[in-house]
Amino acid sequence: MGGFQRGKYGTMAEGRSEDNLSATPPALRIILVGKTGCGKSATGNSILGQPVFESKLRAQSVTRTCQVKTGTWNGRKVLVVDTPSIFESQADTQELYKNIGDCYLLSAPGPHVLLLVIQLGRFTAQDTVAIRKVKEVFGTGAMRHVVILFTHKEDLGGQALDDYVANTDNCSLKDLVRECERRYCAFNNWGSVEEQRQQQAELLAVIERLGREREGSFHSNDLFLDAQLLQRTGAGACQEDYRQYQAKVEWQVEKHKQELRENESNWAYKALLRVKHLMLLHYEIFVFLLLCSILFFIIFLFIFHYI
């Protein structure tokens, strides 16, 4: 495997649109998502093979703003976006929307992979909230591009990751793995150089499988197109352009929230219909058995009477 090589630091103004006519393959765009303290920044460093993101063992987020760093893998540019606390259960603020807008700008025209970082053995209610926030920020369709990355791989000991996932008693984690179509891998972010190279290869194998399944497409929506347009404007963009863009960010997130609520309502309605159908089916079976019992009892009395 060709390892990652350190590339230049990216900025919001450096994003380029995809060019399918170019001989150079488009950059592989990865957004790191997950709850605060799960190891997103350290994972980004492991992917790029360099300590380009600030990473410390803290309960609170070290990353305050969205950041993008780049590298190459087998000649292909890799772009990794690290995110601050935008996937937490918190009130919607202008700072939150600004960070979401920056995330879109840095990853336009859209990510090939949303890398959901989860600490091995610590899948909690906060992780469940983070997953819902991912859907609110990027839309429910974003889950088609989610890859789960478990940190603290060293805690597996000699156990295979597949066995850990198959044998977990955490129903929420099982549902997540099923929703992500079993796309997952694990990292020891403090492993040796050789171990990290092997982890890079395992992750990229999962990403390549996802690419084949999605025919090379990436996740996008109207806001990513707006972000790409603002990128092209570059230095020519004025304050009014940014103000309008931020208003679109708020509108898009609210739209995603509404779609999520509607999907949940539809799911609940369909579940209720299934329950009613089962109750009706069981009721018919109960009536049939009751009539059979009565008929059997009458026959028994008739036979008993004439014996």
Curated annotation (Swiss-Prot):
Cytoplasmic topological intervals: 1-284
A cellular component annotation (GO) from this entry: lysosomal membrane
Presence of the UniProt keyword Transmembrane helix in the record: yes
InterPro entries with a match to the protein in the record: G_AIG1 (IPR006703), GIMA/IAN/Toc (IPR045058), P-loop_NTPase (IPR027417)
Transmembrane segments: 285-305
Keyword rRNA-binding included in the entry's annotation: no
GO molecular function: GTP binding
Alphabetically ordered keywords of this record: Endosome, GTP-binding, Lysosome, Membrane, Nucleotide-binding, Transmembrane, Transmembrane helix
PROSITE patterns per UniProt: G_AIG1 (PS51720)
Tissue specificity statement from the Swiss-Prot or TrEMBL entry: Widely expressed with high levels in lymph node and spleen. High expression found in T lymphocytes, including CD4 and CD8-positive T-cells, and monocytes. Very low expression levels in B-lymphocytes.
Residues engaged in binding GTP: G34, K35, T36, G37, C38, G39, K40, S41, A42, S55, H152, K153, E154, N189
Compartmental location: Lysosome membrane; Endosome, Multivesicular body membrane; Endosome membrane
Region (Disordered): 1-21
Topology of this chain in the membrane: Single-pass type IV membrane protein
Domain AIG1-type G intervals: 25-228
Lumenal side: 306-307
Function of the molecule: Plays a role in T lymphocyte development and the optimal generation of CD4/CD8 double-positive thymocytes. Inhibitor of GSK3A, possibly by sequestering GSK3A in cytoplasmic vesicles and impairing its translocation to the nucleus. Consequently, impairs GSK3A-dependent transcriptional program and regulation of the DNA damage response occurring during T cells proliferation. Required for the survival of peripheral T cells, natural killer (NK) and NK T-cell development and the maintenance of normal liver function. May promote the survival of mature T lymphocytes upon cytokine withdrawal.
Disease: Portal hypertension, non-cirrhotic, 2: An autosomal recessive disorder characterized by portal hypertension associated with hepatosplenomegaly, in absence of cirrhosis. Portal hypertension is defined by a portal venous system pressure that is at least 5 mm Hg higher than the pressure in the inferior vena cava. High pressure in the portal venous system leads to shunting of blood through vessels that are poorly suited to carrying large blood volumes, resulting in collateral circulation and splenomegaly.
Assembly: Interacts with BAD, BAK1, BAX, BCL2, BCL2L1/Bcl-xL and BCL2L11/BimEL. The interaction with BAX is increased, when cells initiate apoptosis upon IL2 withdrawal. Also interacts with BCL2. Forms a complex with BCL2L1 or MCL1 and HSPA8/HSC70; the interaction between HSPA8 and BCL2L1 or MCL1 is impaired in the absence of GIMAP5. May interact (via N-terminus) with microtubules.
Family: Belongs to the TRAFAC class TrmE-Era-EngA-EngB-Septin-like GTPase superfamily. AIG1/Toc34/Toc159-like paraseptin GTPase family. IAN subfamily.
Protein's name according to its UniProt entry: GTPase IMAP family member 5
Annotated source species: Homo sapiens
